[in-house]
Amino acid sequence: MSMLCYTLIIAFLIGIWAAPKSEDNVPLGSPAKSDFSDTNCAQTHEGLKTSRNTDQHHPTPKKSEDQELGSAANIIVDPKLFQKRRFQSPRVLFSTQPPPLSRDEQSVKFLDTEDTLNRNIWANNENHPVHNQGEHSVCDSISVWVTNKTKATDIKGNTVTVMVDVNLNNEVYKQYFFETKCRNPNPVPSGCRGIDSRHWNSYCTTTDTFVKALTMEGNRASWRFIRIDTACVCVISRKTENF
């Protein structure tokens, strides 16, 4: 019996000695949880002040519209990506300098492997000059280099982001597109030039085609077929005869 009492007393003393003494780590007069929450609140409040002051001196930058619109000078493009480029078009040019604005500027040199193809376009146009002996275009068109194309429609009909600036080998290249559009849907009052308006309705319209261009897919550059304006044609329809 006495042995059992001694055992219970020893177990009781061991239990008291092993109990955690949270008061040892707490300032006098304040419970443990109170100090922890007060400290956290103070740190949180101080953090909010610091964050607020930081925001005042350095406002949070908005999401770069240039990256969304294709200005990807900060995105480095692997040169191997250009080795995988297929179906090259003379209407797409990557250059560090602006391309010629018109075919009259023969002194401007292209900085792209498509230089020969582009010069062939100018040569073909010059080998067939327009004379005054009745040789006139059915529609009047204008061709320009587009330097700020940021959005386009791909071959699946989706709107994609076109890269304007390309960082290649630590040099920033711009992506240019040579587009042709109608200058006027009705070059003459009756519609297209040279069409018999007594029997035909006519008007000029811009047509497009697909070219391989460098686009953004998330944070990566990829080749896609996009739609650009490439020609001005005449659309005709027979007039209905009234009896």
Curated annotation (Swiss-Prot):
Residues 47-70 are annotated as: Disordered. It is found in: Secreted. Residues 47-66 have a biased composition (Basic and acidic residues). Residues 19-125 form a propeptide. GO terms for cellular component: axon; dendrite; extracellular space; synaptic vesicle. SUPFAM superfamilies: Cystine-knot cytokines. Expressed by the venom gland. The keyword Secreted applies. Disulfide bonds join C139-C204, C182-C232, C192-C234. Glycans are attached at N148. It comes from the Eukaryota. InterPro entries: Cystine-knot_cytokine, Nerve_growth_factor-like, Nerve_growth_factor-rel, Nerve_growth_factor_bsu, Nerve_growth_factor_CS, Venom_nerve_growth_factor. Residues 1-18 form the signal peptide. GO terms for biological process: cell surface receptor protein tyrosine kinase signaling pathway; modulation of chemical synaptic transmission; negative regulation of neuron apoptotic process; nerve development; nerve growth factor signaling pathway; neuron projection morphogenesis. Pfam families: NGF. Keywords: Disulfide bond, Glycoprotein, Growth factor, Lipid-binding, Metalloenzyme inhibitor, Metalloprotease inhibitor, Protease inhibitor, Secreted, Signal, Toxin. Its main location: secreted. Homodimer. Belongs to the NGF-beta family. Nerve growth factor is important for the development and maintenance of the sympathetic and sensory nervous systems. It stimulates division and differentiation of sympathetic and embryonic sensory neurons as well as basal forebrain cholinergic neurons in the brain. Its relevance in the snake venom is not clear. However, it has been shown to inhibit metalloproteinase-dependent proteolysis of platelet glycoprotein Ib alpha, suggesting a metalloproteinase inhibition to prevent metalloprotease autodigestion and/or protection against prey proteases. PANTHER family: BETA-NERVE GROWTH FACTOR (PTHR11589:SF10), NERVE GROWTH FACTOR NGF -RELATED (PTHR11589). This is Venom nerve growth factor. It comes from Bungarus multicinctus.
